[in-house]
């Protein structure tokens, strides 16, 4: 009996029972809890951003960005929204430019009418994006201040935009692009705009942005982001100049937020002087002053 109880067969039978018990215990353990509240909203925003659903990312991050009192996700949501609105501004500016030139170049009255309509529609979309960027800047730079370090927490979009949108090049020459190609060009332009916004936000190119976000987040200098945001606000303000929306009050509103970026940058530079950054702030301030004259 002693030998039977300690035979190799008995040993392996006991080992199998232990392994099965361990597997059952593991399978019955509690699942990792899903995030709730603000954490869930921000996770949804990141998921939508990765999928290129930037409109949905804005929806999920809206309440977070304006939360009072602020949560740990409020500032992160503001940074993410600043990037998205910047991408939207870039995209709509590109589309407006293409369809404006296309309408001027074409000899076909039907093409001209369609391109004029698209120019108008994208101008309106650009105005909305510009105001969204100004609102986000107001939240992030309230009182002309910004954190020394910010967090851009999001994965890089799974679909990368092209470096150039081929169909828009054809439009600029007055050539016709079918409606389905117009839609795909708009999507390509948006993906391109967001990719370029990410690159500028991390003070580099797309490759640097992709690398920086490989782990899902990256730290950004508050000074650099204030400069980035200020310059993007200048670009956004052009939607209200005499060539586009012709709205002096909104142009001033957007430029005022640009001045808040200047103040935020200057505050940080007082703590840590940097001649090169000081020159960049001066250049930004000059750009704002010049833009205010285009009413």
Can you say where each PLM-predicted feature lies in the sequence?
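Alpha-helical segment of the N-proximal tetratricopeptide repeat
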Residues: 39-63, 67, 192-204
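Bacterial Sec signal peptide processing site at the extreme N-terminus
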Residues: 28-44
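Short solvent-exposed coil/turn linkers within tandem alpha-helical repeat scaffolds
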Residues: 32-35, 64-76, 104-192, 199-205, ...
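Bacterial N-terminal signal peptides
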Residues: 14-25
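Short coil/turn linking the two alpha-helices of tandem helical-hairpin repeats
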Residues: 87-96, 103, 166, 173, ...
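Residue-level recognition of tetratricopeptide repeat
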Residues: 46, 83, 90, 198, ...
């Amino acid at each position: 009996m002693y030998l039977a109880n300690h035979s190799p067969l008995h040993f392996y039978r006991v080992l199998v029972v232990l392994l099965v018990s361990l597997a059952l215990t593991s399978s019955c353990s509690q699942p990792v809890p899903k995030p709730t509240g603000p954490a869930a909203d921000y996770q949804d925003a990141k998921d939508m951003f990765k999928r290129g659903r930037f409109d949905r990312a804005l929806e999920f991050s809206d309440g977070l960005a304006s939360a009072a009192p602020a949560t740990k996700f409020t500032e992160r949501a503001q940074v993410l929204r600043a990037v998205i609105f910047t991408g939207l501004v870039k995209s709509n500016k590109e589309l407006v430019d293409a369809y404006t030139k296309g309408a001027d170049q074409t000899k076909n009255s039907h093409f001209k009418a369609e391109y004029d309509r698209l120019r108008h529609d994208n101008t309106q979309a650009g105005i909305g994006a510009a105001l969204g960027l100004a609102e986000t800047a107001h939240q992030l730079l309230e009182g002309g201040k910004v954190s020394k370090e910010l967090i851009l927490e999001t994965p890089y979009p799974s679909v990368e935009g092209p470096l150039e949108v081929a169909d828009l090049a054809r439009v600029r020459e007055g050539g016709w692009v079918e409606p389905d190609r117009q839609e795909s060009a708009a999507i390509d332009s948006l993906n391109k705009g967001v990719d370029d916004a990410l690159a500028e936000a991390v003070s580099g190119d797309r490759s640097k942005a992709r690398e920086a976000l490989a782990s899902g987040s990256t730290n950004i200098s508050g000074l650099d982001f204030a400069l980035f945001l200020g310059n993007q606000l200048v670009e956004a303000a052009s939607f209200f100049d005499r060539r586009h929306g012709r709205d002096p009050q909104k142009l001033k509103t957007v430029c005022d937020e640009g001045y808040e970026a200047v103040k935020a940058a200057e505050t940080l530079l007082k703590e840590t002087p940097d001649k090169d950054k000081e020159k960049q702030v001066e250049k930004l301030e000059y750009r704002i002053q010049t833009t205010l004259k285009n009413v």
